[in-house]
């Protein structure tokens, strides 16, 4: 039990040391973003802004251009030996679609309706022909008794049976 109390105290002390002692305000005026400090603003990483009014205010530019970065300020009065940081991250998505439950339900219902209409179209296009028997009924034995060829008959009633009448026939 003593070890867990010591360990939880150590974790708490580590987390509290990471907390900023004072807040750094991020302001939005019209369409621009500003970081404001009582003392000077220091850029750490991200969007490099323009310093304004005695280095206490940093203009990050238009919010539509997605300003982001980490900025530091030195403290004043009781926090004059402390330093605090703020992370700014704007994401102004102009081509995004807000996916709320109503939009999601609409997409799902539309998908189901389109699938059913497609299935109905395939069913109607590839519909069954009436009056036609199955393929097994179409096949019949043309020759019986395993004959390969059907013998020709002697008939002289057709127009083409007289064409080679003078030639001898092999029977």
Curated annotation (Swiss-Prot):
One of its GO terms (molecular function) is transmembrane signaling receptor activity. The TCR-CD3 complex is composed of a CD3D/CD3E and a CD3G/CD3E heterodimers that preferentially associate with TCRalpha and TCRbeta, respectively, to form TCRalpha/CD3E/CD3G and TCRbeta/CD3G/CD3E trimers. In turn, the hexamer interacts with CD3Z homodimer to form the TCR-CD3 complex. Alternatively, TCRalpha and TCRbeta can be replaced by TCRgamma and TCRdelta. Interacts with coreceptors CD4 and CD8. Its main location: membrane. GO terms for biological process: adaptive immune response; cell surface receptor signaling pathway; positive thymic T cell selection. One of its GO terms (cellular component) is alpha-beta T cell receptor complex. Pfam families: Ig_4 (PF16680), ITAM (PF02189). The chain crosses the membrane at residues 106-126. The modification Phosphotyrosine is found at residues 149, 160. InterPro entries: CD3_esu/gsu/dsu, Ig-like_dom_sf, Ig-like_fold, Ig_4, Phos_immunorcpt_sig_ITAM. Residues 1-21 form the signal peptide. Disulfide bonds join 37-73. Keywords: Adaptive immunity, Cell membrane, Disulfide bond, Glycoprotein, Immunity, Membrane, Phosphoprotein, Receptor, Signal, Transmembrane, Transmembrane helix. This is T-cell surface glycoprotein CD3 delta chain. PROSITE patterns: ITAM_1. Glycans are attached at residues 38, 54, 74. Phosphorylated on Tyr residues after T-cell receptor triggering by LCK in association with CD4/CD8.
